[in-house]
């Protein structure tokens, strides 16, 4: 049910911060990116499926966004979030329900350097709708009317968990429960299955991550692929071809789990409610893994998709992605084009992209290729600045 909070106007601090709704988000950028790149990558490489999204959740409080929440895949570049949001974008656009699309709160480290944006595409995350996950921004987004909200409530610990803790929910942020109660809106969990295999058998140590965070990298995955990253820099963004399955969970109404009013809750109360919700989500995710996570790669399906889309070779393979993303940025940002098609099936397209974007050659140069990429990736960085 709507609460009294839904009838009140935002506090002055929230009103002053509402510029975040439209500072960077460009629906046209997201649509053009999806049509030119993400649809192909999803169709061939990730082969994502939505399970249980037929009856798409509607707001229980019409004045407040639903809070969608999912699990992080540890030790991997966030391709799972990119694929989930792009698939939902297409699903909801097809059904004329873009109002139901969730906009993500993302870790601020992702936007502080170009290096943590896919292939150095500047402001990639924010142009696609992401907002830095700060307390003020979260509270501000609770007054957002155009879309729903999405977050990964495990936060950075969820990103940094090693393969030995795959599919294990870490402690959830209490802010999710607190704001859900205060604004009378439901939490809608969905579970990301097989993303743990985008970068499998990767582990990390806190003492190493303490230093990598200083240069804008949330964690350093220690894996056999790390050597490949050094000698072939494009592998920094590498994802193995795990079939991503997104499974809708049972919506959660935190007000049903407590008899107290929101203002009566202590920090300990919110922590206890968060743990109760974590256990509910863990049980549902375990069932989703049992149903959809036993064959994470499905090599036969991957081979079939490659054959069906062979005219787009090599663009569905990760080594070709740097040129493709860089060419997209050149066309959209530098040349200001709109409603264009990149003609990925044209013979010689990849070689022409390399010629037009010589920086992409650095992705293939062992060790020293990192020098120009790091210069571009850290130029104008916001490290040490508050989001």
Where are these regions (language model features)?
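Intrinsically disordered low-complexity regions specifically enriched for long asparagine
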Residues: 1, 154-157, 266
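Membrane-anchoring hydrophobic helices of lipid-metabolizing enzymes
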Residues: 2-135, 299-387
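Soluble catalytic domains of membrane acyltransferases
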Residues: 32, 43-252
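Charged/polar, solvent-exposed surface patches and flexible loops
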Residues: 35, 39, 43, 86, ...
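C-terminal folded domains that constitute the principal catalytic or ligand-binding module
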Residues: 222-316
């Amino acid at each position: 049910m709507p609460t009294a909070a839904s009838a009140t106007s935002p506090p002055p601090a929230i009103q002053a911060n509402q510029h975040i709704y439209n500072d960077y988000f460009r629906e046209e950028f997201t649509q053009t990116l999806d049509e030119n790149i993400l649809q192909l990558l999803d169709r061939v490489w990730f082969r994502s499926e939505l399970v249980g999204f037929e009856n798409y959740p509607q707001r229980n409080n019409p004045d407040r966004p639903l809070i969608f929440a999912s699990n992080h895949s540890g030790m991997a570049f966030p391709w799972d979030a990119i694929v989930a949001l792009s698939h939902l974008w297409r699903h909801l656009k097809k059904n004329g329900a873009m109002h139901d699309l969730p906009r993500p709160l993302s870790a601020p480290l992702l936007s502080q350097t170009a290096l943590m944006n896919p292939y150095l595409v500047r402001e990639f995350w924010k142009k696609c709708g992401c907002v830095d996950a700060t307390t003020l921004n979260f509270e501000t987004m609770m007054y957002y009317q155009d879309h729903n909200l999405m977050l990964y409530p495990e936060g950075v610990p969820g990103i940094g968990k090693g393969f030995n803790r795959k599919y294990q929910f870490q402690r959830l942020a209490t802010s999710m429960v607190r704001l859900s109660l205060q604004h009378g809106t439901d939490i809608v969990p969905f579970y990301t299955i097989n993303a743990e295999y985008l970068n499998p058998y990767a582990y990390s140590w806190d003492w190493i991550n303490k230093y990598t965070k200083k240069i804008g990298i949330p964690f350093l995955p220690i894996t056999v692929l790390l050597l490949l990253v050094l000698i072939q820099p494009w592998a920094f963004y590498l994802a193995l071809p795990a079939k991503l399955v997104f499974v809708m969970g049972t919506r959660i109404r935190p007000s049903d789990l407590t008899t107290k009013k929101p203002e009566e809750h202590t920090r300990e109360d919110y922590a206890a409610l968060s743990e109760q919700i974590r256990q509910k989500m863990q049980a549902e995710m375990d069932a989703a893994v049992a149903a959809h996570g036993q064959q994470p790669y499905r090599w036969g399906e991957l081979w079939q998709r490659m054959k069906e889309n062979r005219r787009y070779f090599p663009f569905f393979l990760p080594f070709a992605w740097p040129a493709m993303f860089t060419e997209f940025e050149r066309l959209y940002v530098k040349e200001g084009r709109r409603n264009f098609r990149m003609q990925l099936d044209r013979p010689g397209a990849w070689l022409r992209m390399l010629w037009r974007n010589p920086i992409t050659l650095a992705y293939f140069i062992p060790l020293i290729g990192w020098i120009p990429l790091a210069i571009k990736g850290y130029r104008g960085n916001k490290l040490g600045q508050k989001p």
